[in-house]
Amino acid sequence: LILCVVVCTAAVLGTAAGYESQLPGCPPGAYPAICARYCYSDRDCASGYYCCNTGCLNICVPKPKPGLCPSITQSPCRGNVCNNDQDCPGNRKCCGKPGCKRCYRPKKPGSCPARKYEAGPCVVYCDGDFDCPGDKKCCGGCPRLCEKPCYD
């Protein structure tokens, strides 16, 4: 009877050695050798979390904030400042390589349109993409304006 319980439990739970998550927002890394389901759908998770299938383990993880991580040129790594977007203030996102994550202002998709030379006063209407309404991006150096993005 004990043998049946062990064999049957292993068959139901499954086993895996270090599954890596491939889904956006799912935490990377190795997971326990015993597979388990702590959630079956997003409805099983608290508000602000979603059910993430890591390949072997279903767990509730914080939903990522909107926007994309900027291109990052990092100085030497000094450890994580954040583990996920919820660790960052406001609309900042947790970005970077594992072990070197920092909070950054997010970017919206698309790129800024090419500009012709503009003379006149240097006025800054935005500081980053999320200062702009809708899908507009913060573009230029001087002046900095909210503009409709180009999509390649």
Curated annotation (Swiss-Prot):
It is found in: Secreted. Pfam families: WAP. One of its GO terms (molecular function) is serine-type endopeptidase inhibitor activity. GO terms for cellular component: extracellular region; extracellular space. Its main location: secreted. Keywords: Disulfide bond, Repeat, Secreted, Signal. Residues 19-61, 62-107, 108-150 form the WAP domain. Residues 1-18 form the signal peptide. Component of the acid-soluble and acid-insoluble organic matrix of prismatic shell layers (at protein level). Disulfide bonds join C26-C52, C35-C56, C39-C51, C45-C60, C69-C95, C77-C100, C82-C94, C88-C103, C112-C139, C122-C142, C126-C138, C132-C146. Inhibits growth of calcium carbonate crystals. May inhibit growth of certain crystallographic planes in the mineral phase of nacre in the shell. This is Perlwapin.
